[in-house]
Every structure is written in C-alpha cells, then in structure tokens.
C-alpha cells in the first residue's frame, strides 16, 4: 500500500471518532507503519497532557494499518490484546506512532507499537495480538 492507499484506509475503514484523531501516514516499511498524531486541545485532559486513551486508540489503529499494509489491503481482523505502558506525558507537539509486526502466523499477528513525542522521546509502548477473521 502506498501513502494514498493508507490515507484512504484511515478515511474509510475506521469509526468516525478514530478519524477525528487526525492520524496521517508518515512512513512505512514492509512490516511497519508510522502515523502522525497531531496534538490538539480535544485530545488533552484537564492536566494538559494527551490522554492515555488517545495513545491506545492511535496504537491500535497504527497496528491495524501496518497489518493491512503488510497484507496488501485490509482484511477483517480484531484486536485480541493490547497492553500499554505510559512512560512520559506529552503536552505539546505532534506524536509519531510506529507499529511494527513482530510475527505473523496463520491467524494471529503479534506486534509492538512505540509512541514518540516531538523530540523523539518514547512516551508509550504497547504490545498487541491481532486475529485475522477471514
């Protein structure tokens, strides 16, 4: 999938509230995709930092996009597990969310996601298992 196909996937496959995050493709390899998450007031809680729920949604979305990219297009799939560690708060600047496929089995795909702030510092780390449904 090229950048325009990834943009189309983001625009047509996900729920409206995920589209409202404003994720855009930043880069990709055969087994990974990096999405840019623009920092916006609507993503921050009272403490002024981006909510952890936003990082988890962006991480899950990035992994689905990385899998679709590796498969050459979207297939029905579901997240089986997503374990996230929040390492530092992000108050300002865009965030880069990189999903990397670690192992692809017949039905299960294992991956990890890193969320970096604008300075490249690791803000969150997640591991995930996704099941292909078709």
Language-model regions, residue ranges each:
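Terminal targeting signals and extreme-terminal segments of soluble enzymes
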Residues: 1-134
């Amino acid at each position: 999938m090229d950048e325009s196909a990834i943009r189309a996937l983001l625009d047509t496959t996900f729920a409206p509230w995920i589209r409202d995050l404003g994720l855009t493709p930043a880069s990709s390899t055969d087994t990974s995709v990096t999405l840019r998450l623009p920092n916006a007031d609507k993503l921050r809680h009272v403490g002024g930092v981006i909510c952890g729920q936003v990082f988890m949604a962006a991480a899950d979305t990035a992994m689905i996009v990385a899998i679709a990219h590796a498969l050459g297009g979207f297939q029905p799939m579901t997240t089986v597990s997503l374990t996230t560690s929040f390492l530092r708060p992000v108050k300002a600047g865009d965030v880069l969310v990189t999903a990397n496929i670690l192992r692809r089995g017949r039905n299960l795909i294992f991956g990890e996601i890193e969320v970096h702030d604008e300075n490249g510092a690791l803000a969150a780390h997640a591991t995930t298992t996704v099941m292909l449904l078709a």
